[in-house]
């Protein structure tokens, strides 16, 4: 539904370009590189605003999810889109590198890991290309003592185990107010015991498989290398076919521990506690990332006080993963820059017009009816 919403929203915005962005024009050719975790949604985020502003697109999907993009290209053909407007190029990282360095590309829009994003920024430096980066995250999930704990637990299931934690804005760093920490952890462990694990295509399950053995190995090695804190693993046998990693909770970590600082990109939740709201803000901002954050509290004044202090691109209150095509999404720090969606996203696919619309001709003042001495002595509200 959100992918569809992006096309619907941007189709409407395309009709308003002349009236709302009269001094803007299309950038030109936009090179776009998307990841494998949301192949259709990421495609919609990239292509819809680019086409709405009159650009052409060269898009490279991830190696594992090329078929989604190729099917979309066929839909474009059936819809009558002119050849050359949307171009899908499949391949590995070498193909993406060719797109990034091609001299005829006017803009690069990339969603993926921070490491690759850093290399893309280096490659485009000095080239004059426009650049949008939406990178990794280590998003804090803050639970205050006055929060509805049952709702916060359910929200956390969606925040970290949706799509097996393979989400850039996953709430993977749990910060719990000390007065309710024991109760919250108990409720969370009870909920973890009831998580349904199985076929990702089955809509009734909570957690599916990781994308491939490489990702499974990475998650496993990061967790096994950690010796701090207390680990709780969802009980039960994992399905044999597929890269299923059990949902894992690790509590009692130090803010400087590797698992509290680095993006795991899997179904692993790490946690620590805080005593005061100011400490919660300090812990939340104690990372090189800044993509998203979630705050759970029944006190609206507390929420409105905490949210602006969080160094993230988006803050959700008493909810998570709440997105809309009309709202710009993006990060700060090493989570990237630029926005996708909303007016901010549209502006990223435009440039100022070099030739403005001509002004209407104004007739010269003949002097008739003016002051006799030629001096205007009327009162002015300066």
Regions found by a protein language model. Give the residues of each.
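ALDH superfamily catalytic-core signature
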Residues: 115-254, 283, 317, 364-365, ...
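Gly/Ser/Thr-rich beta-alpha loop segments that engage phosphate groups in nucleotides
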Residues: 30-33, 56, 64, 93, ...
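CheY-like receiver
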Residues: 70, 98-99, 155, 283, ...
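Conserved C-terminal structural/oligomerization subdomain of aldehyde/semialdehyde dehydrogenase
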Residues: 81, 105, 142, 196, ...
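Thr-Gly-centered strand-to-loop micro-motif
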Residues: 53, 59-60, 110-111, 143, ...
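Structural signal for hydrophobic packing residues in well-ordered secondary-structure cores
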Residues: 7-15, 76, 80, 103, ...
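Rossmann-like NAD(P) dinucleotide-binding subdomain of oxidoreductase/dehydrogenase enzymes
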Residues: 6-12, 16-151, 204, 274
